[in-house]
């Protein structure tokens, strides 16, 4: 049976940290499913379709991975995909408490599903989509945070939002 891992997230927008984690996960697992979360209660700057499209462009050339979206309970999605592992990024100690709580909740919901935490490269430890959106809204250059096309989409979306 193929070793599949699920990497869930909102990816609003996709960052160099996300791309780094995807690339490294494909070196460990036979197939990585990047699962874009559609969360009706969570407000995102980009639509689900836009987030998927940005991920497709950003991950071109990375083998053994696919991009899908899902809505609902993560453990149910993982089961449907016949996976037993999900991977989560831990940037800083501040991420740990939330991710630990989620991992334990998921384990309680399905003890067969494991959560693996991966650290990003040191140069990406501070990156978060939320921080990048904030910095972008103040007009900063984002070349160290996101790909050029993501920066352009981000600035366009923020300009539309501010009008």
Question: What does each model-identified segment do?
Answer:
Residues 1-163:
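Nucleotidyltransferase catalytic core that binds NTPs
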């Amino acid at each position: 049976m193929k070793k599949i891992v699920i990497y869930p997230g909102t990816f609003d927008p996709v960052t160099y940290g996300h791309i780094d984690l995807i690339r490294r996960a494909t070196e460990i697992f036979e197939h990585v499913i990047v699962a874009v979360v559609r969360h009706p209660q969570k407000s995102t700057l980009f639509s689900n379709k836009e987030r998927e499209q940005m991920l497709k462009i950003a991950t071109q050339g990375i083998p053994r991975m696919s991009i899908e979206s899902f809505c609902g309970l993560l453990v149910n999605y993982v089961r449907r995909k016949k996976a037993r592992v999900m991977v989560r990024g831990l940037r800083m100690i501040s991420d740990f408490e939330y991710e630990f709580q989620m991992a334990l909740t998921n384990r309680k919901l399905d003890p067969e599903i494991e959560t693996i935490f991966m650290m990003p490269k040191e140069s990406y430890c501070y990156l978060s989509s939320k921080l990048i959106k904030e910095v972008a809204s103040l007009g900063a250059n984002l070349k160290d945070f996101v790909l050029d096309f993501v920066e352009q989409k981000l600035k366009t979306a923020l300009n539309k939002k501010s009008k």
